[in-house]
Amino acid sequence: MLYPKLQAVTPLDDYMLALVFSNGEKRVYDFKPNLTHKFYKQLNDVELFKRVTVNDGEIEWATGQDFCPHTLYEMSVRCN
């Protein structure tokens, strides 16, 4: 399957992420389940979590964590 490219991310309350993809879809992803994994433990700091950015189609944080854009697309809920 060819996935649309992630273009924008906005952190929301309760570790949710608002996502915008290149096909115009707006989706929401609940990041909370990932926070139990050691790799994402630092992101329990909500201020750090809110500093999420998009780099070349995937989300990342300055502390080195990133997340697969295909998983974001498949596991998120469409809003439009």
Question: Predicted segments — roles?
Answer:
Residues 1-80:
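Motif-centric detector for short Cys/His coordination patterns
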